[in-house]
Amino acid sequence: MEAMITKEFFESKTTIELARDILGMRLVHQTNEGLLSGLIVETEAYLGATDMAAHSFQNLRTKRTEVMFSSPGTIYMYQMHRQVLLNFITMPKGIPEAILIRAIEPDEQAKQQMTQNRHGKTGYELTNGPGKLTQALGLSMQDYGKTLFDSNIWLEEAKLPHLIEATNRIGVPNKGIATHYPLRFTVKGSPYISGQRKNSIRTGIWK
């Protein structure tokens, strides 16, 4: 097992830095069926009170967003279109910023169980989207409020991307200037990026 990411790592960085720096890290979920895991290849940063695209815009505090005001490394799960999405809180208590995990590259030894969790989906379809990866990993709303440092979900050091690309976030229309923030970060060339074009897929994406 590689070195696990600590709370101190989260506390030493901004939300945007974290969204970039966790690319290539291994996301692990310990389940009754064993360890399910993959390398993070796509994230989005959400900047809280000043970000119209964030659930916590203007410090909106509801039953759903309450956990966003918790400490760094807390897990924020929410449902959208029958899918469950995974986010990590990034800033000190009271500053509701987060990272959405949008895609992972599944680890080979976990693919069989992850394929079962995805009802037979294989190839890039296995984990090339935020709802797909949570289903593949067996994550659910029951993981809301856990932390990455004392639960069955954690991050490990793994690989470093050759190139990271920053683009507009997906699915945030009509959010004023926030619609155009370049806060989506991807490992350039990864076939598992959501909506990836075939002619954009590259080999040798890791250092």
From Swiss-Prot:
One of its GO terms (molecular function) is DNA binding. Gene3D superfamilies: Methylpurine-DNA glycosylase (MPG). Transmembrane segments: none annotated. Its EC number is 3.2.2.-. One of its GO terms (biological process) is base-excision repair. Keywords: DNA damage, DNA repair, Hydrolase. It comes from the Bacteria. InterPro entries: Formyl_transferase-like_C_sf, MPG, MPG_sf. Pfam families: Pur_DNA_glyco. Belongs to the DNA glycosylase MPG family. This is Putative 3-methyladenine DNA glycosylase. It comes from Listeria monocytogenes serovar 1/2a (strain ATCC BAA-679 / EGD-e).
